[in-house]
Amino acid sequence: VSAEREAAEREWTAILQADLAEYDVARTRWVRARDVVLPNLRTRADLETASYGAGRAGIMEVLDAFTALANGRLDALDKEADVARRAVRFTLIYGQDQ
């Protein structure tokens, strides 16, 4: 019985560690999208808009930049939702105090 219990504890520990690693990866991806990618896309959209105003860029460059920004926002939201799903999963499986 003791050996079975130890095996079960090792299995749960391995599952918990894998879940924590997956959560960390998902959170890192979300934070990077939010703090690095989105600001860069905003800057690009602002620069393309200014270039268009100065006559150095066409409307397609501006539209492409704003399309990329919109897609970046959607991607960041998807990543945030993934982190939230994983957090809920932790709460349901391991409890709130863990």
Q: What does each model-identified segment do?
A:
Residues 1-75, 79-93:
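Amphipathic alpha-helical coiled-coil segments
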Residues 96-98:
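Short, solvent-exposed mixed-charge patches
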